[in-house]
């Protein structure tokens, strides 16, 4: 099944040693067959991160992914398959949000003007040691506390 294949190594490597934090939308596009070019690009990024071992996510990303992929995209995934994907993603570096994360996210919200949830994603990327945060929802090229935000769909060809 194509949707499970992207969880397997594909022999591609990132050019950087930086850990890469994936925002929920990138993972969703990797599984959303109706996403066209974004699906293809996200699938490639996702496979490269599996191979490199540089992928970082958070509990928030896993929660948002499960809800979106099983309820909100045009062709939803079966809940058991989505559960298996979440289980596989737990093999990545997973940042667990705690009280300190919430306070730091609020500081990011105050300083940079992002929503609380986006600020929590940025905080998780920082806490997870990521040098790059891939998201289509945040300001491409902005650097926050050493984390560079990149929109992989904004530039062609995309590179870290």
Language model feature labels by segment:
Residues 1-57, 72-80, 158-159:
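Short, well-structured N-terminal submotif of metal-dependent ribonuclease cores
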Residues 57-59, 134:
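Short beta-strand segments at enzyme active-site cores
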Residues 1-17, 122-160:
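Acidic, PIN/NYN-like endoribonuclease modules and their adjacent C-terminal/linker elements
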């Amino acid at each position: 099944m194509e949707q499970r294949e992207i969880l397997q190594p594909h022999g591609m490597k990132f050019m950087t040693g930086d850990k890469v934090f994936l925002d929920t939308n990138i993972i969703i596009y990797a599984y959303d067959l109706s996403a066209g070019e974004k699906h293809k690009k996200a699938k490639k990024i996702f496979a490269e991160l599996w191979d490199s071992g540089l992928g970082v996510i958070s509990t928030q990303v896993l929660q948002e992914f499960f809800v979106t992929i099983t309820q909100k995209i045009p062709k939803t995934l079966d809940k058991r398959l989505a559960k298996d994907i979440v289980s596989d993603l737990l093999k990545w570096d997973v940042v667990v949000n705690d009280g300190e994360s919430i306070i730091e996210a609020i500081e990011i919200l105050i300083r940079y003007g992002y929503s609380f949830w986006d600020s929590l994603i940025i905080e998780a990327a920082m806490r997870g040691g990521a040098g790059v945060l891939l998201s289509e929802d945040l300001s491409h090229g902005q650097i926050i506390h050493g984390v560079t935000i990149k929109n992989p769909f904004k530039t062609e060809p995309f590179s870290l």
